[in-house]
């Protein structure tokens, strides 16, 4: 009976380790103040209390630069075969790179903007260093 208990303990330990690794391998990056980047399918979302999605920068997010109060997102919108529920209008089509600026404090989103528009936007706010080394 002692041998059976040892086998149970070993199996339970292995199961716990597997669950821990699966749970830790999630493709979510918490960006602070309720913002999350999801690697798959590649979008940024802000969640209100509970599980209510407040806004979403739809796929595909190519890179982002995150600070405590701001978030700069480089995005290439994808066309889906199904209807995409997004409030954003892409004035130059979906084959263009766009940028979004998120003020986490006020939870406001500026974008989609072209690179030149984003440079002007950030210079007006003395934040042009955010474009350097955009992840």
Annotated model-derived regions:
Residues 1-8:
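Positively charged n-region of N-terminal signal peptides that target proteins for export
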Residues 4, 29-30, 105:
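Intrinsically disordered, low-complexity regions of eukaryotic proteins
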Residues 9-70, 74-76, 88-89, 129-133:
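N-terminal export/targeting and maturation segments
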Residues 44, 69-71, 79, 99, ...:
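Hydrophobic residues embedded in beta-strands of well-ordered beta-sheets
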Residues 51-57, 79-84, 106-111:
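Short, surface-exposed beta-strand/loop "edge" segments at domain boundaries and coil↔beta transitions
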Residues 75, 101-102:
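Short beta-strand element of the conserved SAM-dependent methyltransferase core
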Residues 79-100:
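Structural motif
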Residues 103-135:
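C-terminal partner/receptor-binding element of secreted or periplasmic proteins
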